[in-house]
Amino acid sequence: MSRRSDLSDKDSQSRKRHWLTDQAVTNEEKEQSPTKRTRKTKSQGLGGLFNTFFGMFVSSNSGEKEKTEVSGEVQVQEDDEIIVEGTTRRVAENKKYMIFLNEDAPVRANAGSEENEVIIEKHVQKNVEIRNDEEKQEVQGDLVLTLSSSPKSPKNLEKSFEVQQDDEEPDVLFEKVVKTPNKQLQEARRFQNELIFLNDNPDTPDDVSVISDSRSKEFISPTPDDSVSRPITPSLSSLSNYTSNNVRDYWRRNSAKKPEVLRRVPVRHQFKHSTSVRKMNTIIDLKKIKNHLSSRDRLLQGVVASGQYEAKAISGIVEKKPKKMQRTSSTDILARAKNKIAELGGSRSNTPSLLSREPSIIIDSEESTSSSYRQHARSNSSESDSYRKLNDILSQINSLGIGSAYRGPQRYQNSYQLSKQKEDKLLEEARIREGHRSQTRGDRLEDVRKRLELQGIAIRPKVEKKKVDDFMALPDAADALVERAWSGGNPNEQFVDAFSIQICKKDLATLSGLHWLNDEIINFYLQLICDRSNGDSKYPKIYAFNTFFYSNIVSKGYASVKRWTRKVDIFAFDIVLVPVHLGMHWCMAVIDMGEKKIEFYDSLYDGNTAVLPALRGYLEAESLDKKKTAMNFSGWTIQQMTDIPRQQNGSDCGVFSCQFGEWASRRTTPRFTQKNMPYYRKRMVYEIVSKKLLATI
């Protein structure tokens, strides 16, 4: 054993045996092995000295001759077959060479079928005679070492060994008994490695990450076993290239937790035909199917070659076929096809484009369908006639070109072109008409104006009014002022004093939330409207009665309010605002002297009929008292307004009435709604405290 270890250190390949080295046997390698018998040298003492001087003399006289050493060049195949190809010339002192009596590969391969066979390999050291072949020396420069093949039994091996040895007995290094043929052992080991590889590395799709679980879809920290630096797991088609050296991964740690990428498939399932076909996104990958089938066949061959199972037991798996797809009855398919052809035949007269369709234009899916039907028809002889008829019907259907991808555009191409041309003509006509209309619009208006002037009707051109923002944003100071007015504190705190009216905190508090407005707020706001008209001439002149005016007229008559206007001529104003209080509801009446109309605004529209007659009687009495003439109401319009904003609760009537008066003072139609009431409440607080209205014309 020490002999083998010393020689193996000089070879880089661990699988080569120690007697296959290409170097000459040195003096250190001459040490006797434990199994080698000691041989006495014939030349000892004076005889040995004489032989030494004689060898030196002969070597000096024969300088032209060269002493050669033959070392065996050995080539090792993948299955460790040992073959002697040839020898090379080298000078050696002892002329002893390493040979072995293994038989060549073809003979040993043929011998693998014998069951009870015993092969004894004897590795000896012997003087070898060199047969010089000039022809081979010129071509290869090598000497051929001829070995006679012997039968495969211990006795034949011993006889061949005795024939080859000379007078001296060869040195037997060691003997090795091989109970099983070498090639069969290698195949059995390779198949065992493949099974180990299948158990350790299940076939997983390449697109699954090693750090994620496809079932839980939760992130899993990678372990050393799942490092991305490791090579990708090879497919089953490349398992035959792996040996025992690269099957096991020694870097793997058993304690490391492995992520469950996919459920492991047992090895026995690899032999099933159903598991060898995998569908990805409903598309069958034929290349993967072939690889799985080839891997399955390779594994079955390995099982048989290893001798673990008999070929008869495995034949049942090979001959097992997949279940046939359940198909509908052929009679039903024929009946449906005939009905479809009848429908298409009846519609062919209405669709002339189908007659001109080439029968060669069909969809690929239909071709594949017909071909699949043909394959099934060939496999099932009992239904061959039915499938032949079905194929004929399908060919007729395909010849019509119903499934053609180009049928639609070609069928409607002419109609599309006609509609496109018609559309282009209409667009061009519309463009010409619009251009002519824009050029002659002024002339036509002038002609109409002249014809109307001849009839006595004048048409005034419309004057574009300036757009006014009726809901402008409040200034920044308004929020602070409103917060101060509506916060807790002394309710008698005075905020403003104008128009002989004092506004305190308790008065401003009526504008918060859904509180009812009191008399001070309404009177003060109406005075702001009058003050704005006095300061700017573009506004109509406004006069406003206080909140007690209408109550006195109704309850006490004209005499109770006669002295209220002794210094004021209400007929000199353009608009007179009359706030109307109906007990628990506020309304607004507007008397427009310039436009001769009396309007009553009620946000609830409860059908009150007493307000308008009372105001008309007041105007008649006031005219007789101040002008000494009767009031002439011819041409006047007295009505209750209906198309006005309506309140949606029972607390905003005071705000509605004030805004009706403000919009009427500008002679504009009110456009606010219930949703604007919170805005108007804050705005009225700011306008009252600042004594200035924000709305303008």
UniProtKB/Swiss-Prot annotation:
Chief subcellular location equals nucleus
Top-level taxon of origin: Eukaryota
Region named Disordered: 1-47, 365-387
| Entry GO terms, CC | nuclear envelope; nucleus
Locate the compositionally biased regions of type Basic and acidic residues.
Answer: 1-14
Q: Where in the cell is it found?
A: Nucleus envelope
Knockout consequence? RNAi-mediated knockdown causes increased presence of smo-1 conjugates during the first embryonic mitotic division.
InterPro entries per record: Papain-like_cys_pep_sf, Peptidase_C48_C
Cite the EC number: 3.4.22.-
Q: Please give the residue ranges the record annotates as the region Protease.
A: 501-664
Q: Does the keyword Protease apply?
A: yes
GO MF annotation list: deSUMOylase activity
Keywords tagged on the record: Hydrolase, Nucleus, Protease, Thiol protease
- Describe the family membership recorded for this protein in Swiss-Prot or TrEMBL: Belongs to the peptidase C48 family.
> What does this protein's UniProt record list under function?
Protease that deconjugates smo-1 from targeted proteins and may catalyze the processing of smo-1 to its mature form.
Q: What is this protein called?
A: Sentrin-specific protease
- Name the species this protein comes from: Caenorhabditis elegans
Gene that codes for this? ulp-1
